[in-house]
Amino acid sequence: MVKVGVIGLQGDVEEHIWAARRALENLGVSGDVIWLKKPEQLENISAIIIPGGESTTISRLMVKNGLFEPVKKLGEEGLPIMGTCAGLIMLSKEVIGATPEQKFLELLDVKVNRNAYGRQVDSFEAPIKLAFSGEPFPGVFIRAPRIVELLSERVKPIAWLGDRVVGVEQDNIIGLEFHPELTDDTRVHEYFLRKAV
């Protein structure tokens, strides 16, 4: 049975839990999606989602709750991890605009700009092209970070807004600028969870 954990310290956790449950159903896979708060919940975990929210807060709480090092280790060992918005920042190797005390998992060879799109008023929705699906995907961007550079050959673009890369994959790791959990479309979650089944 698949066990998916959504890091539930801050951010849009419930939306990811619902999206992951629907995605597993659509894939015909039996599994459980849990609200991940403590390191002991990582036992037998199949995949992890790091939601949007505020990256400084998520970073601090992951360290405080003892999740930071075990999640980093699992990612390095090949466990599928997907980060959206602030989750992408948490996964990135280099972050422009980070605060000095912020720690990052550094599992994804990308450079991101932390608040590239500005304040809440600059949030928008636009169709995204996906590498793994012919139909456009409804991309919801909320004070999104921006992927400014791919730092290694291992990073593959999987989502585009026009000609700009807004989603990437590196082996077991997926990082997205946008919020797939805020739509009724589960294609991105299904693509990610196929790595775990």
Curated annotation (Swiss-Prot):
Superkingdom of the source species: Archaea
UniProt keyword Cell division, yes or no: no
CDD domains tied to this protein: GATase1_PB
Associated pathway: Cofactor biosynthesis; pyridoxal 5'-phosphate biosynthesis
Any single Gene Ontology cellular-component annotation: cytosol
Keyword Hydrolase: yes
Entry EC number(s): 4.3.3.6, 3.5.1.2
Gene Ontology MF term list: glutaminase activity; pyridoxal 5'-phosphate synthase (glutamine hydrolysing) activity
Pfam families documented for this protein: SNO
Catalytic activity from the UniProt record: aldehydo-D-ribose 5-phosphate + D-glyceraldehyde 3-phosphate + L-glutamine = pyridoxal 5'-phosphate + L-glutamate + phosphate + 3 H2O + H(+); L-glutamine + H2O = L-glutamate + NH4(+)
Family assignment from sequence similarity: Belongs to the glutaminase PdxT/SNO family.
Record function comment: Catalyzes the hydrolysis of glutamine to glutamate and ammonia as part of the biosynthesis of pyridoxal 5'-phosphate. The resulting ammonia molecule is channeled to the active site of PdxS.
PANTHER family hit by this protein: PYRIDOXAL 5'-PHOSPHATE SYNTHASE SUBUNIT SNO, PYRIDOXAL 5'-PHOSPHATE SYNTHASE SUBUNIT SNO1-RELATED
Subunit architecture: In the presence of PdxS, forms a dodecamer of heterodimers. Only shows activity in the heterodimer.
Protein name: Pyridoxal 5'-phosphate synthase subunit PdxT
Organism of provenance: Thermococcus kodakarensis (strain ATCC BAA-918 / JCM 12380 / KOD1) (Pyrococcus kodakaraensis (strain KOD1))
Taxonomy of the source species: Archaea, Methanobacteriati, Methanobacteriota, Thermococci, Thermococcales
Gene coding for it: pdxT
